[in-house]
């Protein structure tokens, strides 16, 4: 069977939910027995989002093979339950960088290097490579931004060319748009969608399906009008209504026959999607009996997308505890020794997630100290683990001024120091310790118990600094347990204080591996402890 290509574009406004639509379709096709992969095209000039501010971009999602990618890849992985790779996120910067390197090496044999064909060919190669490396039946490609953005033009041209390259039966174009509802007039407006489709057709792409994002049901009359003016079948105008829970969306799209229309267009002979388990999960999510309060102490809390995988992992772990996770967003910059008890007193559990830079670190340290001294279940992640070690050094070991060499290079007690293989690296982008690495677990520890007594667990990392082993014996003598280390025993991966209900911190990012139907184990152990603490 030829590989099938589905392209998802957006119009009218950005952040309309293209990624969720693409991920939901991926889940439906996977449940039809098809092998699916998915990728995101981002038209910005950055090579990747690794050096972008979380306020600009939100979370950086890391793949198994160490690619720093768009947060939509997190949605893709959680919905479809697949592990993506470096070909799943492509940016303008990455494409131009590769094309220019080829030009410098003389690979274009003296030709004038142009957007067409060189940039568009490179984009098409990325699409095909993503399908080839995963041996997929179907690849879904989402293009970031909206039709009409100048940055998107080479991407859309590449998508247009794909139809001629692989055949019309192997390509489908899905266009997502906003259908605004004017309360004063009491009507929906189709004109923005019509203009968006007109713009897309002007670029040579005729959409085969429209997905309309709307707050209110559109009604068949609106669908027929859009079908007529946009030249799509009435049944191929699909509603994406606002929902209480994201995981309802695949079921809503299936109820409208979206996946069947896609299969018919692409001539895919696949059985109906069995969504029984997914539906049961959604029913459970909608009817959770308990509630648990988790305080998230972070420096980017003004933009909650900066912690989207953390939030989803907490929710997933709540599901298996029959508990709705209520998150109290605590700005680390506001936390002091004087107000920490007031800010965190009602927390059933405290999580201190990752981050970079000095701002907010002292507030996080105060939150960690509060959790340790008051025996509140606490999970530290990445920088959260490093600050857990610093807090212990200062307030238990008495090492006044203990810090990280990253945050205070002049510190007398560099509890956290730069990794040896990072010392001579000057570039910031793409140079961290990235991707999947193993951690050897200490038998009898809370970490080992969380992972069902596995000897080794593999999780994704994103860091440049590590625990300074010169202090390891001093920590252990005071009851601090290093419950996870690299197989060569050189890098500290997990730390804990066994006397507390749950006081565990890890260098890696467990949230990146969590799924709604398969929550990450360390997060589950943490949320379980928080639920028990709430009783």
UniProtKB/Swiss-Prot annotation:
Residues 1-268 are annotated as: Amidoligase domain. The active site is at residues 382, 509, 511. L-glutamine binds at residues 55, 355, 383-386, 406, 464. Mg(2+) binds at residues 72, 142. It holds the Pfam family CTP_synth_N. ATP binds at residues 15-20, 72. It catalyses: UTP + L-glutamine + ATP + H2O = CTP + L-glutamate + ADP + phosphate + 2 H(+); L-glutamine + H2O = L-glutamate + NH4(+); UTP + NH4(+) + ATP = CTP + ADP + phosphate + 2 H(+). One of its GO terms (molecular function) is metal ion binding. CDD domains: CTPS_N, GATase1_CTP_Synthase. It is an enzyme of class 6 (ligase). Its EC number is 6.3.4.2. Pathway: Pyrimidine metabolism; CTP biosynthesis via de novo pathway; CTP from UDP: step 2/2. GO terms for cellular component: cytosol. CTP binds at residues 14, 149-151, 189-194, 225. Residues 293-535 form the Glutamine amidotransferase type-1 domain. Allosterically activated by GTP, when glutamine is the substrate; GTP has no effect on the reaction when ammonia is the substrate. The allosteric effector GTP functions by stabilizing the protein conformation that binds the tetrahedral intermediate(s) formed during glutamine hydrolysis. Inhibited by the product CTP, via allosteric rather than competitive inhibition. GO terms for biological process: 'de novo' CTP biosynthetic process; pyrimidine nucleobase biosynthetic process. InterPro entries: Class_I_gatase-like, CTP_synthase, CTP_synthase_N, GATASE, GATase1_CTP_Synthase, P-loop_NTPase. Keywords: ATP-binding, Glutamine amidotransferase, Ligase, Magnesium, Metal-binding, Nucleotide-binding, Pyrimidine biosynthesis. UTP binds at residues 14, 189-194, 225. CTPSs have evolved a hybrid strategy for distinguishing between UTP and CTP. The overlapping regions of the product feedback inhibitory and substrate sites recognize a common feature in both compounds, the triphosphate moiety. To differentiate isosteric substrate and product pyrimidine rings, an additional pocket far from the expected kinase/ligase catalytic site, specifically recognizes the cytosine and ribose portions of the product inhibitor. Homotetramer. Belongs to the CTP synthase family. This is CTP synthase. It comes from Streptococcus pneumoniae serotype 4 (strain ATCC BAA-334 / TIGR4).
